[in-house]
């Protein structure tokens, strides 16, 4: 399955990226090469391979849960460029 130029443009738009025409052609070739490699990997017979859950025999070495006081809201908001109603204001990136 080869990606068309339009599909590469759609991926770029969804990723909030913009490219020049040369770059789009380059990415189209590179993405198609990646997809060919994935197709090649899909042809490998793995029916007799047991799924690998852990690479080594280690168990989780998490530290014990310890309740700690959180930062005061004033300290958190002190370095924020903009805040409102005890929250940090960030630029909208979804839906643009």
Curated annotation (Swiss-Prot):
Entry EC number(s): 6.3.5.-
Highest taxon of source: Bacteria
Alphabetical list of InterPro entries matching this protein: Asp/Glu-ADT_sf_sub_c (IPR036113), GatC (IPR003837)
One GO BP: regulation of translational fidelity
Record's keyword terms, sorted: ATP-binding, Ligase, Nucleotide-binding, Protein biosynthesis
Enzyme class name: ligase
Membrane among keywords: no
Pfam families with a match to the protein in the record: GatC (PF02686)
Gene Ontology molecular functions: asparaginyl-tRNA synthase (glutamine-hydrolyzing) activity; ATP binding; glutaminyl-tRNA synthase (glutamine-hydrolyzing) activity
Catalytic activity: L-glutamyl-tRNA(Gln) + L-glutamine + ATP + H2O = L-glutaminyl-tRNA(Gln) + L-glutamate + ADP + phosphate + H(+); L-aspartyl-tRNA(Asn) + L-glutamine + ATP + H2O = L-asparaginyl-tRNA(Asn) + L-glutamate + ADP + phosphate + 2 H(+)
Function text: Allows the formation of correctly charged Asn-tRNA(Asn) or Gln-tRNA(Gln) through the transamidation of misacylated Asp-tRNA(Asn) or Glu-tRNA(Gln) in organisms which lack either or both of asparaginyl-tRNA or glutaminyl-tRNA synthetases. The reaction takes place in the presence of glutamine and ATP through an activated phospho-Asp-tRNA(Asn) or phospho-Glu-tRNA(Gln).
Similarity comment: Belongs to the GatC family.
Quaternary structure and partners: Heterotrimer of A, B and C subunits.
Record protein name field: Aspartyl/glutamyl-tRNA(Asn/Gln) amidotransferase subunit C
Chain's gene name: gatC
